[in-house]
Amino acid sequence: MADEMASNEAALHRLDRTLTWQGFRELLPISLFVIVFGAAFGLAATQAGLSDASIVIMSTLVFAGAAQFASLELWGPHIPLFTLVLTVFAINARHLLMGATLYPWLQSLQPAKRYGVMLVVSDANWAMAMQAFSQGRPGLGLLLGGGIALWSFWVLGTWLGLYFGNVVSDPASLGLDMVMGCFLLAMVVGGEKNLRMLVIWAVAAGASLLAYRYLPENSHVVVGAIAGGLVGLFWGSRDHEY
């Protein structure tokens, strides 16, 4: 029995080419919608005065749609660097929570591989990976392969936006902004349901609501992510100690 449990646990930590390719294929449908938003970003960045090369490089290295759109609002001859960094951090603070929830499965990887996987983590592949883990299936392939799919189509969409962005200048007008929200809601409903996840999300939600009420604007995203992330990190560490 112990050997079987150890074998099942080891399977959850698997990350190989087969699982990565499977993850790529599973995230392919949602990745196609990412092209539209990438094209919208390419157009918006062009209108903001960025060069074609810098636009594609930004999408390639940053891979953070909402943060990239927000950075365009601050773009100009004199870029307020501190404000830009703070804005990007606030928008992406949810990755602290994602990293905390993934910690139990990522910690067995070598550091280079672990951080390589985290470079392509976004909402969609994180949600699918967490659902897989909750069902006793390997999820790291979904995380890496799905992330590569999303990243590839984001960069491709950005490049297409340089030339054809006017066709999809406003994805929200076509209702496409609801696609990712509906996808994530479906993942949450079918995702992991245990005390650890309940406490993490409850703490994150409570801290975020308090910050929204009493702290400066937009700080609730950072506060909620840090609070939930710390709970997830501490709980994950305690589980592996015993």
What are the roles of these predicted feature ranges?
Residues L12, V85-S173, D177:
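Helix-loop-helix junctions within the multi-pass membrane cores of secondary transporters/permeases
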Residues Q47-A48, A53-S54, M58-A93, V167:
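Membrane-interfacial helix-loop connectors
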Residues T20-L32, I57:
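Residue-level signal for short hydrophobic patches within transmembrane helices
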Residues F63-A67, A90-L97, F183-M187, S208-L210, ...:
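Alpha-helical transmembrane segments and their membrane-interface exit regions
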Residues L28-F41, V62-F63:
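The first (N-terminal) embedded transmembrane alpha-helix
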Residues L97-L106, M128-S134, A186-K193, V231-Y242:
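C-terminal ends of transmembrane helices
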Residues M1-G23, G236-Y242:
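Intrinsically disordered, low-complexity non-transmembrane regions of multi-pass membrane transporters
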Residues R137-V223, F234:
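Membrane-embedded alpha-helical modules
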